[in-house]
Amino acid sequence: MKKIKKILALGLVSVLAIGIFAGCGSKSNDEGKSNKDSKDIKIGVCPGPYGDMVEKAIELYLQSLGYKVEVVDFTDYVQPDQALASGEIDANLMQHTVYLEKFAEDNNLDIKSIIEVPTAGAGVFSEKLKSLDELKDGDKVAIPTDAVNLARSLRLLETLGVIKLKEDVDATKATTADVTENKKNLEFVTLDAAQISRSLDSVAIGVVPGNYAIAAGLDFNSALGVEKLAEGYKNVIAVRGEDVDSELGKDLKAAVESEEFFNAITEDGSEFKSFDRPDWWTAKYGDK
């Protein structure tokens, strides 16, 4: 399987812009149609275990249906949805439902979830502390800058007793302005989610989304707290709205519901074995 590293530099943007005005837009559409007809598909992922999930748990079933799968690596949460909406890729696996729906609404994108997958929750990590009880007055706490994961991080910190939020706040939209109790006057530092694991030496604790924690080699056994994923916070395979009921959408959903996928998730030594299971999985397989 080929992997592509998506790196957007200013020069590349300029080249792409020139290409658009030269008529590359129509060529791209033709290529997209050709890919679909030949069952060549591109699936976008972010740093973490979900590229491995495509390769180890999803690809085999798709290959049996005649697909050729190419994984496209992105470095942030923004590009994969934009690339999906524009037709540059055919699906992505890198975000939960709450983030997907908010990003799609905010950016007027027609992208939809087709199925949830087992997902690693966020963790609270530190290079300096062995317990949250060791937090001192004025310590810095790194949390993701994007609105959805920021709210998710605050909710986790509240669950762990570090802070308290307004009782009537929508937990999916909470901000630092909604913190009503912060006994240790903690200073919240917002960073791109991918940067937090690399910034633990400059803060007391950091809340790292599961995929980035795994990509950084962080050990969840040493985490100071681990998120129990609420409904809507398990990662999903997303496609364009037009593909939800298409052959591609149905085949991607079937791949996740397949025996091959189940075996890859549950086998001894699987990196996905401890991931939170979606509701459909529990209904189908129980606690396996």
Which residue stretches match the model-derived regions?
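Ligand-binding clefts/hinges and TM-proximal coupling segments of bilobed small-molecule sensing domains
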Residues: 148-173, 253-288
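A conserved helix-loop-strand patch within extracytoplasmic ligand-binding domains
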Residues: 114-163, 262
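Short, low-complexity disordered leader/linker segments with a strong preference
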Residues: 1-40, 283-288
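A bilobed periplasmic-binding-protein/Venus flytrap-type ligand-binding module shared by bacterial periplasmic
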Residues: 121-133, 233-246
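Beta->alpha turn/N-cap motifs
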Residues: 75-77, 87-101, 118, 192-193, ...
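Short, polar/charged alpha-helical segment
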Residues: 40, 47-70
